[in-house]
Amino acid sequence: MAADIINGMEIRESILEELRGEVANLKRDYNVVPGLVTILVGNHPASLSYVTLKIKTAIELGFHEIQDNQSETITEEELIGIIKKYNEDPLIHGILVQLPLPSHINEGKVLHAIDPNKDVDGFHPMNLGRLVIGGNAITFLPCTPAGIQELLIRSSVETLGAEVVVIGRSNIVGRPISIMLTQKGVGGDATVTLVHTKSKNIVRHCQQADIVIAAVGVPNFVKAEWIKPGATVIDVGVNRIGFNEDTGKPILSGDVDFVNVSQVAGKITPVPGGVGPMTIAMLMRNTVRSAFFHLSL
């Protein structure tokens, strides 16, 4: 029996509808419009595509949106200077620097330069530290892990007491979602095993899991025989495996062998249309929350 498809586009739309109401309340009650700046260095096609989607969504929600495109030759010092300018701009509540950056720029230094209270991507060390502490300490959740957790919650996937395997230990997805799923509350209280390329017995771990989250960056890495019947499978991978000359678009594959795994799993996310749309929705939610937060500063 084929798995139920977790439709990230539909869940994204319901979240954006909720945010439209919050944006309207901000405007009506406080005359405040959420402000988001997206900083793009160079013209990397994938980065340009991602930024365009983010800008489009922000405009649809009624944000004050600034697109700041910079040449690939910009220096690290100049880029940090631009960030500091937006740190001090009261009309800007969220600062997004699109990664990757050119090799001559230290990404860590750039991300550290963002005001933690405007770090709507949730990558600043201070916000990652708040995530570890949990509870009321949390300011902004990293967008992709937050999107994964929201998919689980809104798809009625029980995490309380669940055995979860996260494949991948990146600071962007694997580590944060592992922490979030072990915290107390809705979408948490799980028992999490984090595995990676150096782990032994990855297959055995996955076969015991109620939920498998694949964020390893290898096309079709997770096989059907790895999955316990009825388990939930979340595919974070977006891998370009070819190019469709008829449509002019890249051919994408996730980290999961979708065709075969979907015959075993109970629920599964597709690629595209699963986790990806949720990442942008969580960025928008963080920006709205930042606008509310700045009312008290």
UniProtKB/Swiss-Prot annotation:
Pathway: One-carbon metabolism; tetrahydrofolate interconversion. GO terms for cellular component: cytosol. Its EC number is 1.5.1.5, 3.5.4.9. PROSITE patterns: THF_DHG_CYH_1 (PS00766), THF_DHG_CYH_2 (PS00767). Pfam families: THF_DHG_CYH, THF_DHG_CYH_C. InterPro entries: Aminoacid_DH-like_N_sf, NAD(P)-bd_dom_sf, THF_DH/CycHdrlase, THF_DH/CycHdrlase_cat_dom, THF_DH/CycHdrlase_CS, THF_DH/CycHdrlase_NAD-bd_dom. The keyword Iron-sulfur does not apply. One of its GO terms (molecular function) is methenyltetrahydrofolate cyclohydrolase activity. It catalyses: (6R)-5,10-methylene-5,6,7,8-tetrahydrofolate + NADP(+) = (6R)-5,10-methenyltetrahydrofolate + NADPH; (6R)-5,10-methenyltetrahydrofolate + H2O = (6R)-10-formyltetrahydrofolate + H(+). NADP(+) binds at G168, R169, S170, T197, V238. It comes from the Bacteria. One of its GO terms (biological process) is methionine biosynthetic process. Keywords: Amino-acid biosynthesis, Histidine biosynthesis, Hydrolase, Methionine biosynthesis, Multifunctional enzyme, NADP, One-carbon metabolism, Oxidoreductase, Purine biosynthesis. Homodimer. HAMAP family: THF_DHG_CYH (MF_01576). Belongs to the tetrahydrofolate dehydrogenase/cyclohydrolase family. PANTHER family: C-1-TETRAHYDROFOLATE SYNTHASE, CYTOPLASMIC, C-1-TETRAHYDROFOLATE SYNTHASE, CYTOPLASMIC-RELATED. Catalyzes the oxidation of 5,10-methylenetetrahydrofolate to 5,10-methenyltetrahydrofolate and then the hydrolysis of 5,10-methenyltetrahydrofolate to 10-formyltetrahydrofolate. NCBIfam families: PRK14168.1. This is Bifunctional protein FolD. It comes from Lawsonia intracellularis (strain PHE/MN1-00).
